[in-house]
């Protein structure tokens, strides 16, 4: 079954929300010790990056405030450098970069959902 733009938007939004749920109420130290949580967060970031790559350029250009290259680039690092992933950087990304990104993703989803 061919995936649609809406599917990728849902993937992107859902994975961003998952990372926040997975890390809610835990400390960096707990995150570093809990392999299940860190792996789940890494997987969600991979999904976000893959979905970002699948969103057409004409859509991405309408939302320049979303750091498309950074989102996709994180996926590439996680996939290709999996053995050298620094969990502290993942934690910082989830805690500092994703919270301001989520409202932008939601706005984009709401606007585009009307067109789909």
Predicted feature residues:
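Solvent-exposed interaction patches of small proteins and small membrane subunits
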Residues: 1-116
């Amino acid at each position: 079954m061919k995936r649609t733009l809406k599917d990728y938007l849902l993937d992107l939004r859902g994975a961003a929300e998952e990372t926040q749920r997975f890390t809610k109420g835990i400390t960096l130290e707990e995150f570093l010790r809990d392999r299940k949580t860190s792996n789940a967060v890494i997987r969600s970031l991979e999904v976000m990056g893959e979905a970002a790559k699948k969103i057409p350029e004409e859509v991405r250009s309408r939302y320049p405030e979303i750091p498309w290259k950074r989102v996709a680039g994180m996926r590439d690092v996680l996939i290709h450098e999996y053995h050298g992933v620094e969990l502290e950087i993942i934690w910082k990304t989830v805690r500092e970069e994703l919270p301001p990104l989520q409202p932008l993703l939601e706005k984009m989803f709401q606007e585009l959902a009307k067109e789909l």
